[in-house]
Amino acid sequence: MASHKDVKKVVLAYSGGLDTSIILKWLQTELGAEVVTFTADLGQGEELEPARKKAEMLGIKEIYIEDVREEFVKDFVFPMFRANAVYEGVYLLGTSIARPLISKHLIDIARKTGADAIAHGATGKGNDQVRFELSAYALNPDIKIIAPWRDWSFKSRTDLLEFAEKHQIPVAKDKKGEAPFSVDANLLHSSSEGKVLEDPAQEAPEYVHMRTISPEAAPDKATIIKVGFERGDAVSIDGVRMSAATLLAKLNEYGRDNGIGRLDLVENRFVGMKSRGVYETPGGTILLSAHRAIESITLDRGAAHLKDELMPRYAELIYYGFWFSPEREMLQAAIDKSQEHVEGEVTLKLYKGNVMVVGRESGKSLYSDKLVTFEDDQGAYDQKDAAGFIKLNALRLRTLAARNR
C-alpha cells in the first residue's frame, strides 16, 4: 500500500455508486482524511441528488455537484469531432473524452478547498487511472493522487459488497437482484463491462442497452433530419439553433428512437490487455456521419487526406489520456485551422440502426457541377489537359518498367 499518511484533505471524484462510496468510507477510516466530494453532471441521465444524500449520510460537509454538460460538449466533445476521431476504427471515445474534464474540476476544487490530494475510483487494470492522473499532473504537477484500487486489499466487487454491507452503505441493484454492470455514462455515450460481457463469444443481453432501442424494434418509417454546421461544429437541427449540449441531447433522442449507435467491441487498453465492452453512442454516431459529409464538400483534398492521416494519432492521444499534452494541442491547432470553411447543412436519413447521408449543401462548397457534369460543361474543363497530367505522373512508372523488363 502506498503511503498517504501526510494527506489531510482529499477531493474525491464521486458518483454515488459502489466503488466511490466504498472509497469515501475507506479514505475516512483508513487514512483519517477529510473528504470533499465532486460529482459532475455530464448528462449521464441520472438524478444527482441521491449522490448528495449518500455523501451527507457518510458525513461529508463539502459537496460539489456541478452541471458541466455545456463545457463537456463545447470544449471537449466538439473539438474531438472536428477531427472525426475514432480509436481502432470504431470507438468514438465517449469515456476517454470525459476524464480530462473531471480531472480539471478535481484540481480546481482542490485549489479552492485547500486539499492536498485528489482520489478516483478507477481500477489498476484499466485506462481511466491513466487518463485521470495524466490530466491531473498536467494541470498541477505537485498534486498527490490516491488510487485506492491500487492500494487496498479488496480484490473483487464481491469484496466491495461485503465492505458495503459491513458499513451499511446502500448499493444499487439491477432488475435481476445482482450488483449492476460496470457502467459509465455521459451525454455522448454509455458503456457496460463485466459479468457475462467478459466472454467475448456471448451476445450481450438486450437489457444491457440503456440508450437505444434495438434496430429490429425501430420504426419502419425513416426519420429525416438536417444538421447545420459552422466552423466544423454542429449548431442547428432542422434550422433551429441550439446550444452544444442541447443539440447533442436532441441527436441522442433521434439515435435512440432509430436504434442507432450500438457497438460491441474488444479494444486494446493502454495498459496492455484486451477488454470487451458494449457501447452506445446514438447522437455521436449521427454527428460523425454528418460532419464527414459536410467536410466532403468544403475541405480541399490535400487537407482532408492529411486530416485522415493525423486522426488515428489524435484519437490514440485521447484514448491514452494525453488531452492536455503539447502534441494533442498541436494537432488540435491544425485540425481547427482546417475547419474554417466547414459550414453548411447535411440531410440525413435515420432508419433501423443506419445513418445515411442523402444531401449536403454549403456556401463554401468546393463541389462544382460544371466541372464534374457528364453533360456539356460549356468549356469549364478541357479534357485534353488530362493527357499531360497522366504522362507526367506515369513518367517514373514507365522508367521503372523500362529498367525491369
From Swiss-Prot:
Binding site for L-aspartate: 123, 127-128
Record's subunit section: Homotetramer.
PROSITE patterns: ARGININOSUCCIN_SYN_1, ARGININOSUCCIN_SYN_2
Chemical reaction(s) catalysed: L-citrulline + L-aspartate + ATP = 2-(N(omega)-L-arginino)succinate + AMP + diphosphate + H(+)
HAMAP family: Arg_succ_synth_type1
Any GO BP annotation: argininosuccinate metabolic process
Positions bound to ATP: 13-21, 40, 121
GO molecular function, a single term: ATP binding
Residues annotated for L-citrulline binding in this entry: 91, 96, 127, 131, 182, 191, 267, 279
Compartments reported by the entry: Cytoplasm
Any one cellular-component term (Gene Ontology): cytoplasm
Protein's name in the database: Argininosuccinate synthase
Gene: argG
This protein's pathway: Amino-acid biosynthesis; L-arginine biosynthesis; L-arginine from L-ornithine and carbamoyl phosphate: step 2/3
UniProt cross-references to Pfam families, sorted A to Z: Arginosuc_syn_C (PF20979), Arginosuc_synth (PF00764)
Keywords: Amino-acid biosynthesis, Arginine biosynthesis, ATP-binding, Cytoplasm, Ligase, Nucleotide-binding
Enzyme Commission identifier(s): 6.3.4.5
Family of this protein: Belongs to the argininosuccinate synthase family. Type 1 subfamily.
